[in-house]
């Protein structure tokens, strides 16, 4: 199994969110391929599911995930190489907003819980696939910190679009 470093510090980092943001620049999308079993494979799998592909969210980039990535690349007119790289991620992530439900929302909620990005396990969004008030609060707080400290182009609107997804998925890796 490949355990490549994707983006940012390794899983298990306990840096506070503000410390992360102080040094944060827009990280490149991670490169994921068959054999990987590192963050953010679960996010990739959730987004594939959100796009209609049947794949388990198990954190392992196995044959089923590889087939789903290749199928998505064909559907999207991308180079079919089975690698989830910048172009695949940019086409794959689903814009979500308050009131939305489903696997893309679950991905976001998992990301906020990953290494306690939410700031407090007690306040972390419940992973239920519903973009409710608690999830929106975390999105807006995260966007505001990003806007103030690292990426002034980030709009604080509670909508998770391409740039917000890239920041959330790549901020810790």
What is each model feature region?
Residues 1-173:
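Cell-envelope/ECM-targeting effectors and their regulatory/trafficking segments
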């Amino acid at each position: 199994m490949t355990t490549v470093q994707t983006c940012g510090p390794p899983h298990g980092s306990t840096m506070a969110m503000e410390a992360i943001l102080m040094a944060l620049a827009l990280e490149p999308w991670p490169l994921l391929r068959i054999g990987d079993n590192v963050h953010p494979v679960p996010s990739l799998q959730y987004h594939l599911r959100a796009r209609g592909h049947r794949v388990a969210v198990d954190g392992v980039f196995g044959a089923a995930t590889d087939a789903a990535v290749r199928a998505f690349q064909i559907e999207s007119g991308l180079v079919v190489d089975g690698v989830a790289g910048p172009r695949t991620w940019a086409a794959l992530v689903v814009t979500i907003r308050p009131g939305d439900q489903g696997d893309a929302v679950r991905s976001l909620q998992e990301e906020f819980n990953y290494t306690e990005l939410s700031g407090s396990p007690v306040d972390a969004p419940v992973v239920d696939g519903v973009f409710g008030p608690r999830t929106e609060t975390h999105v807006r707080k995260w966007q505001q910190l990003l806007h103030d400290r690292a990426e002034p182009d980030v709009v604080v609107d509670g909508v998770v679009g391409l740039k917000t997804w890239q920041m959330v998925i790549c901020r810790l890796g």
